Amino acid sequence: MLAELGFIRTIGENDEVPVEPESDSGDEEEEGPIVLGRKQKALQKNRSADFNPDFVFTEKEGMYDGSWALADVMSQLKKKRAATTLDEKIEKVRKRRKAEDKEAKSGKVEEKEGQADSDLKGQENPGEDEAGSKDEDSETDYSSEDEEILTKADTLKVKEKKKKKKGQAAGGFFEDASEYDKSLSFQDMNLSRPLLKAITAMGFKQPTPIQKACIPVGLLGKDICACAATGTGKTAAFALPVLERLIYKPRQAAVTRVLVLVPTRELGIQVHSVTKQLAQFCSITTCLAVGGLDVKSQEAALRAAPDILIATPGRLIDHLHNCPSFHLSSIEVLILDEADRMLDEYFEEQMKEIIRMCSHHRQTMLFSATMTDEVKDLASVSLKNPVRIFVNSNTDVAPFLRQEFIRIRPNREGDREAIVAALLMRTFTDHVMLFTQTKKQAHRMHILLGLLGLQVGELHGNLSQTQRLEALRRFKDEQIDILVATDVAARGLDIEGVKTVINFTMPNTVKHYVHRVGRTARAGRAGRSVSLVGEEERKMLKEIVKAAKAPVKARILPQDVILKFRDKIEKLEKDVYAVLQLEAEEKEMQQSEAQIDTAQRLLAKGKETADQEPERSWFQTKEERKKEKIAKALQEFDLALRGKKKRKKFMKDAKKKGEMTAEERSQFEILKAQMFAERLAKRNRRTKRARAMPEDEPTGPAKKQKQQQKSVFDEELTNTSKKALKQYRAGPSFEERKQSGLPRQRRGNFKSKSRYKRKK
């Protein structure tokens, strides 16, 4: 009856309901069939036939507004001459290659059918070439045999932990070191109404563990030394108590009261964005002073004395020495975010200089994901009676992260590029971050993946600030699917929606690995990391498997798939070289144009007026900066690596050849990581200095000492045991006499009789 009227009927007691079988997570499982890129596009087209393609939701999904406060930052960027982008160059080379391939194919046809017939066909159908080129652009050239190979599924195996031997105790590094009220909510923290309104507007429901522990202590005005895993909301943990303090105690004069130091420009922009959103309903002003942005506009903003200044150490020192009205004597709160990273880089001397110039009567908050010896030294110098907050272990990965590893066989290091290309074209097609060890390899991977037809961006130190922000914006807005980055993007950046992190090589240390994979599975979301592990990196893999709480998977790609992609990359080597040549030509053109511009400017102004412009001063001389850079650089001339004949020979051979092979490139990436690990091991072997803060490493179990029973008057009188009588007859012991101040017992003048003497 209900079915006839078009209603959905209810399920009866005797009706059987088909239940979908749950996915079995056994020791070995095979993923579903691979769907290639062009088939996915065709499926998407068929699905969207019923819907209007121009329809857009008015509200974006996410925790808070997607604008990311980039508009005002982009306006401060240094305006440079517009040049062709790398993607345009890649597209140009791709079109040229397709045209050459088409000519080669048409040449074969001409040999068979005759030149005259082909000419006639060309005259009759002049529009065929354009249509064909469009079809080729939309589809990748895969034959039926190739599709059979490329659609083979990968195999996943569970990597078992090795059982611990008896006597090996697990180290409890920072675990359960801090206690906090787990039922605490934002409403219970006594925050002002404007802040609670901003928290609600940003979509925060419950505070994270680090926020529950830090915000109440920060509101008391105490110094904080906090250590928590990456992606746990440290920015809001220090921003909320600072904003509450500024609202509660308004400023009397126009001075900057809060300084936030960050290691990278991108992290600075992110902290500035979050702070601005938290302060949107109050009159607190913020300013961003990082490298790459216009110096003059920053100086103008600093003269207005903003309440909160977010800066990188280098640009801050530049302003302190060259902006007369700007100083740090009025700073009430100093925040050091990602302190371990700042001391890893070349910021050590700069950090000391900034702390020296800050006000002594200040509250200091030090936040770090890892607690290294350098961070402890910095804490002992900058903090006064700090409250130590360690929420969880710094070697913990996110709880919902699925870790996968791909083994690289011995003498097959050159397969890394082919494996990454296979993963990105077959399995992980969007919202992917690919980490490399060097800037050169990141740039090469961008070109290579671009030539394979993928939407790629890159993020590393060789790019200008405009290019960095543009890459981040495009990745966030889903204009590009893959972001190739070095460790510059491995810390603190909260890029929403990252599904997969791929490691081209294993990073320097386990801590760096934790930071890299921390870009995904953030704030309770699920994510996946895939790392390529060679024979030289097996030791680190064992450490990661040992520390993992969830089972770790081993992914196995079919060998014929790897060979197919390896052949494909070998064919693209000429195109990669062509793109690099175009870049080199453009760079030379820009340099010559810049020289002409400077010459014209000098002629227009006159040499005298040009010389009158004051040079920007710095707290170190050029020679001191050069020495510091060489001392910390990981190059063949590094003092720590002298005598390593193998490595020096490898570097020399690579320089002689000029262009390295795929295996040599992979070897160079691993070599860089090993160099860093070696330096770290040397640093750890140094004798440790005495610190103001107590050590956090757990000491060994103390031996239990037997407690001596105190002398009791009535017990001594009533105790008639053999031992008690013996002690009573012997009288007080030497210690008892000493404590009570009795004179020592004098020995008598007893002499043994001659009969007891030994006979000679």
UniProtKB/Swiss-Prot annotation:
Annotated stretches, region: Disordered: 1-50, 80-149, 605-624, 679-760
SMART domains per UniProt:
DEXDc (SM00487), HELICc (SM00490)
Q: Which UniProt keywords apply?
A: ATP-binding, Chromosome, Helicase, Hydrolase, Nucleotide-binding, Nucleus, Phosphoprotein, Ribosome biogenesis, rRNA processing
By its UniProt entry, which InterPro entries does this protein fall under?
DEAD/DEAH_box_helicase_dom, DEAD_box_RNA_helicase, Helicase_ATP-bd, Helicase_C-like, P-loop_NTPase, RNA-helicase_DEAD-box_CS, RNA_helicase_DEAD_Q_motif
Where does it live in the cell? Answer: Nucleus, Nucleolus; Chromosome
Q: Which GO terms describe its molecular function?
A: ATP binding; ATP hydrolysis activity; nucleic acid binding; RNA helicase activity
Catalyzed reactions per annotation: ATP + H2O = ADP + phosphate + H(+)
Q: What class of enzyme is it?
A: hydrolase
The enzyme's E.C. designation? 3.6.4.13
Q: List the disulfide bonds.
A: none
- In its UniProt record, which GO terms are filed under biological process? rRNA processing
Residue intervals of the Helicase ATP-binding domain? 215-389
Where in the sequence does UniProt note compositional bias of the Basic and acidic residues kind?
Answer: 98-122
Q: Where is this motif: Required for interaction with the PEBOW complex?
A: 55-57
Annotated PROSITE patterns = DEAD_ATP_HELICASE, HELICASE_ATP_BIND_1, HELICASE_CTER, Q_MOTIF
One Gene Ontology cellular component term attached to this UniProt record is: nucleolus
**Keyword match 4Fe-4S:** no
Residues where Phosphoserine is found: S23, S25, S48, S133, S144
Subunit relationships = Associates with PeBoW complex, composed of BOP1, PES1 and WDR12. Interacts directly with BOP1 and PES1.
Q: Please provide the record's free-text comment about the domains of this protein.
A: The C-terminal domain regulates nucleolar localization.
Function, as annotated: Probable ATP-dependent RNA helicase. Component of the nucleolar ribosomal RNA (rRNA) processing machinery that regulates 3' end formation of ribosomal 47S rRNA.
Which family does the record claim for this protein?
Belongs to the DEAD box helicase family. DDX27/DRS1 subfamily.
- What's the protein called, per UniProt? Probable ATP-dependent RNA helicase DDX27
Q: Which organism is it from?
A: Mus musculus
**Organism lineage string:** Eukaryota, Metazoa, Chordata, Craniata, Vertebrata
